[in-house]
Amino acid sequence: MKRSIVFIYSLVILLLSVGFIDAFKISIENHIKLSDDSSYQIGTGIYDITGPGAETNMMGYAMPGQITGGIHFRQRARAFVFIDSEGNRAVYVSTDSCMIFQEVKIQVIQDLQEIFGPTLYTHDNVLLSGTHTHSGPAGFSEYALYGITALGFYKKNFDTICDGIVQAIVKAHKSVQPARMLTQQGELWNSNINRSPYAYDNNPEEEKAMYDANVDKNMTVIRIEDMSGNPFAAISFFGVHCTSMNNTNHLISGDNKGYASYLWEKHANGQSSLPGTGPFIAAFGQSNEGDVSPNTRGPTCRDGKPCDYKTSTCNGKVEECWALGPGTDGDMFESTQIIGGNQFNKALELFNNATIQVSGKIQYRHTWKPFTNVSVEAPYNSGVEGATTCRGAMGYSFAGGTTDGPGAFNFIQGDNSTTNPFWNFIGGIIAKPTPQQTACQAPKPILIDVGMVEPIPWVPDVMPLQIITLGQIVLVAVPGEFTTMSGRRLRNTVREIIGQSIENPIVLIAGLANTYSGYIATFEEFQVQRYEGASTVFGPHTLGAYQQEFANLAQSIVDGSQADPGTFPRNMSGHTPFFLPPVIVDVAPKFDDFGDIYTDVSTTTPYSINQTVTVIFYGANLRNNFMTESSFLTVDQLQSNGQWTTILNDGDWDTKLYWKMHDLGFSLITVDWTISPITQPGTYRITHSGYAKKNPFSDNLTFYQGISSNFNVQ
């Protein structure tokens, strides 16, 4: 099988090239009995998960040419440990990553159990959720579909993500303190739209009439404070894609949710605080964002005319139809600021007005469910007798992309045909759909029969289903992207059952959690086969199966019974190769060294507010060392005592670091600093640090640093 995967990856590379384009035990006795059911112990932690800033395909848009070329601001894992008065505990982690893959969750649990033992933190009580930023490095899944454009499995990136999540949880574990939670809900408008209204409109009229909009406008915020009322953390849930940064971006970014976290943590910790240092931690968790875009100006053709409503095309071409964010002329950086800022401002408002006391037990249920042949019974089968899920398959519209990022090839949403030779060929050599598979997936025209590949399918087929209750807050961890209406139906299903034992439950979708299985559209949305329907892997009854199985988990909480643990998924370790060549050697020009200046700052004319300071260094490949919990750059201010103080680093919004390979084979590192209005007048400098591989026959790396000339800000 490994040889066949190697063959397929090699073939993909060929086709693209020709234009087809701490290791110690920590005591677990860290909790005390609390006196009532609204008192908890809560700990928080944050850690860097930023991956390779050079030469690595980015996860989300599946665009072969979207390769990392620097860092806008770093990506982080934010962890929360909750313990109730009986000692029951649960963990919620929000990561600035596109999603959580099965392999990540399994590795994180293994690592936690090596530290804490086998029973404290398990698959049952640890929930990992991705924000769905499309501006992070790919290659952290061993399932082939999610690694084709990444050229396989990048273990160094995978390890960085897993280690960062574990360290965030360890920090949270060590910081638990008596605490309480308050919550508040409210509506946030002008921050999300439905990107597939044609599919949404296919849902029943009476169901649509129950809601004010075709996307969820509701935001839920959890305020976490100590027993004196001093807040130290917050979690927000709001469904919107992290696609404010489009597929022309090459800088690592947390997108709008990462920026919202950055804003709140700066607000709470002080503007002079450096990112990721706490103590206040704010997570902007993902929810049912499947058909929800942050590009609120909507899709238009490049000539200014509206895109076709059904197919999102312009003159029959998907690549001409783009949705723009609210930034000036659709500027993606400004759009990220606006949508992220809107989420922060609304969350802060709800946080400051939170009055609903969270009280009750911490409970959790988890099962591993094989999802390729689930019999779906009434009332979840959409009235179809004998309804089942199917082995995984991707439809034609999957390759068409969305208005947030049209596909690389001319597929059309809602169209069942293509003449594109690349995807026809790839789909043909993987597996031919059987008549049974074709019938099961109908009306989806199968492009890539990912579930029929033997012996290992190209997508996960055993789903981790999980519910965690924090008092009346119910977190439903879904392993994929539920559309707006799918999320509403699932919340209603869980609320109806769990409301038998929890008064006034607040049911929340925690999206892209624990593994990733594509999209989950409603039965009706599936029929029109836009992108979300074509990417609903297990067929038209996928949502019904999720409703049915989550109903069973909710019922087990009501009954006080244990959930069936289910079938643990296959071990994927070592199944997927990596075809990105390693860094062979770094070189600098003959009369220069790493860290020397290529283009310096202005030393004669002072800079002003809103101007951008630029300096270019001779550097090395950013893949050598990811500078985890550190920085490739600093902006330093000269103090009156003659010492330098770092005021910004590469985790800050105001800086950008670009990596580029010069034609002569050396790396150029460009650092931009846009001077914000809160910057104090004075003398400044910019530094760049990194590691160079000087010897092609050794893996040893050499640290280097470059420092700009001093310059003034007036």
Curated annotation (Swiss-Prot):
InterPro entries: Ceramidase_alk, NCDase_C_sf, NEUT/ALK_ceramidase_C, NEUT/ALK_ceramidase_N. Belongs to the neutral ceramidase family. In contrast to other members of the family, it displays a highest activity at acidic and not neutral pH. It is found in: Secreted. Residues 1-23 form the signal peptide. Optimum pH is 3.0. PANTHER family: CERAMIDASE (PTHR12670), NEUTRAL CERAMIDASE (PTHR12670:SF1). Its main location: secreted. It catalyses: an N-acylsphing-4-enine + H2O = sphing-4-enine + a fatty acid. Hydrolyzes the sphingolipid ceramide into sphingosine and free fatty acid at an optimal pH of 3.0. Has no activity toward glycosphingolipids, such as GalCer and Galbeta1-3GalNAcbeta1-4(NeuAcalpha2-3)Galbeta1-4Glcbeta1-1'Cer or sphingomyelin. Keywords: Glycoprotein, Hydrolase, Lipid metabolism, Secreted, Signal, Sphingolipid metabolism. It comes from the Eukaryota. The keyword Lipid metabolism applies. This is Neutral ceramidase A. GO terms for molecular function: N-acylsphingosine amidohydrolase activity. Its EC number is 3.5.1.23. GO terms for biological process: ceramide catabolic process; ceramide metabolic process; long-chain fatty acid biosynthetic process; sphingosine biosynthetic process. The active site is at residue 293. GO terms for cellular component: extracellular region; membrane. Glycans are attached at residues 218, 246, 353, 373, 416, 571, 610, 700. The keyword Signal applies.
